UniProtKB/Swiss-Prot annotation:
One GO molecular-function entry: Gly-tRNA(Ala) deacylase activity
Pfam families in the record: Tyr_Deacylase
Compartment(s): Cytoplasm
GO biological process annotation, one example: D-amino acid catabolic process
Positions occupied by motif Gly-cisPro motif, important for rejection of L-amino acids: 138-139
Keyword Plastid among UniProt keywords: no
Keyword Manganese: no
Assembly behavior: Homodimer.
Name of this protein: D-aminoacyl-tRNA deacylase
Gene label: dtd
Entry GO CC: cytoplasm
Taxonomic superkingdom: Bacteria
Length: 150
């Protein structure tokens, strides 16, 4: 499971011209799922993301988590995070899970993030053509891969 987590002032998802969801201050998490991902990956990533100390404390030091900052989280599926650009100029997405595997994993991840956060997360729609609008704060952007725990 690979995520790109961005600290945002606000973010929203629009599908077919209709607002699907939005958040204020918090995290926008783009998540890509591959076949070898497990429930353990879901739990590890959800805990890691909700406890990342990337929000400023009273001294302006990044020392607070999204939970401590009272922030929100939006999770959006993005299979292109598993693109391979090794050969040629056209990315290959063979490592990305097919929907029959990825959809249940995505739903489980959203649910686990919500449990860790203590409130439901906002989401996009799996597989939809979405317009994501965000105001990146910092910018702070963190890439995490559960298959490569650095």
């Amino acid at each position: 499971m690979r995520t790109v987590t961005q600290r945002v002032q606000h973010a929203s998802v629009t599908i077919d011209g209709q607002l699907k969801s939005k958040i204020g201050k918090g995290l926008l998490v783009l998540v890509g799922i591959e076949d070898k991902d497990t429930q353990e990956d879901i739990e590890w990533l959800a805990k890691k993301i909700t406890n990342l100390r990337i929000f400023d404390d009273e001294n302006g030091v990044m020392n607070r988590s999204v939970i401590e900052a009272g922030g929100e989280i939006m999770v959006v599926s993005q299979f292109t995070l598993h693109a391979s650009t090794k050969k040629g100029n056209r990315p290959s997405y063979l490592k990305a899970s097919k929907p029959d595997i990825a959809i249940p994993m995505y739903k489980a991840f959203c649910e686990e993030v919500g449990l860790q956060l203590g409130k439901p997360v906002q989401t996009g729609t799996f597989g939809a053509d979405m317009k994501i609008e965000l105001l990146n704060d910092g910018p702070v952007t963190i890439i995490i891969d559960s298959q490569n725990k650095e």
